[in-house]
From Swiss-Prot:
Residues 1-64 form a transit peptide. Disruption phenotype: Impaired photoautotrophy. Seedling lethal. High chlorophyll fluorescence phenotype and severely affected photosystem II (PSII) subunits accumulation associated with a drastically decreased synthesis of the reaction center protein D1 due to a reduced translation initiation (ribosomal loading) of the corresponding psbA mRNA. Plants lacking both HCF173 and HCF244 display stronger PSII defects. SUPFAM superfamilies: NAD(P)-binding Rossmann-fold domains (SSF51735). It holds the Pfam family NmrA. The keyword Membrane applies. This is Protein HIGH CHLOROPHYLL FLUORESCENCE PHENOTYPE 244, chloroplastic. Keywords: Chloroplast, Membrane, Photosynthesis, Photosystem II, Plastid, Thylakoid, Transit peptide. The gene is HCF244.
Amino acid sequence: MASLRLPAQLVTRGNLIHHNSSSSSSGRLSWRRSLTPENTIPLFPSSSSSSLNRERSIVVPVTCSAAAVNLAPGTPVRPTSILVVGATGTLGRQIVRRALDEGYDVRCLVRPRPAPADFLRDWGATVVNADLSKPETIPATLVGIHTVIDCATGRPEEPIKTVDWEGKVALIQCAKAMGIQKYVFYSIHNCDKHPEVPLMEIKYCTEKFLQESGLNHITIRLCGFMQGLIGQYAVPILEEKSVWGTDAPTRVAYMDTQDIARLTLIALRNEKINGKLLTFAGPRAWTTQEVITLCERLAGQDANVTTVPVSVLRVTRQLTRFFQWTNDVADRLAFSEVLSSDTVFSAPMTETNSLLGVDQKDMVTLEKYLQDYFSNILKKLKDLKAQSKQSDIYF
């Protein structure tokens, strides 16, 4: 099997081009150039390439092939073997749990961290340490794997390109070189319509890169997670802290990550879905104000809402562009601006449900999800208050 070569733009940040732009544009991504042999650099350490490596700050070279990790040709791989990348995240952990419940052999790729992901081992998964920002750590994690489910995303303090573009390109190329049978990639709904937003452009370019890689794959675009609303609205309201909203009528069809995991594994078993682009959306699209109002009703108390006009986000984004050290902040503000514009992040699920053989009535609604959360948390708070009163004994 041929050794893998990483695209040159992974290490030369200034020469990237936009997927719809001419080659003279700068600062944009190019999924086509990633696939072009003349734009690749060897991953083998050699004396001739060492100076080039130093100039471009390339990570330690890595050979990505079956031979590189002592995988004998013809080694059988169980169809139930899955590698979940980003397994500790909001979606990743639900994928792991669902896959284990359905009898899959689950391996979890997680970054080395001071607090190990013991809960994944407790569930029955195997945990391996690797880092997408260090491509040389990837190949060993793919040995004996049939399917990769990619839930990974960069940390807030990292440049968006580090994991979400450079790391994903390296992972996809390693998967191709090592004969992975299927690759599931999660993207963002409408990412193809917002090339001005770095994160959405990256998602779209990764979709195209995966499509052209030749890997058997499924791409799933998502609108939003219900779980994210807990920290954003539910908890601050209960703690009588400010919640942040905008004056825009953006609507998002939030979906329970447990439903996303369930539908993903159904899609995984359906060979007719190979190579398809699916969009998963919740039963209804909600505005920020509607979500806040629902939380207020379920919590039984009013929210302290701080409204940020969309115009402020736009101005702030432009100001941060003046300073190199704030570029990543500006990238994230660009995404926030899209979320705060007059946009609907939703899609009809009729065709997808029919393809997967699922019933829309089985999907968790946002009302049900938040009602369960507030019921549980308010009961716990009530019990804690009762215990506190019982312990208040004065002499």
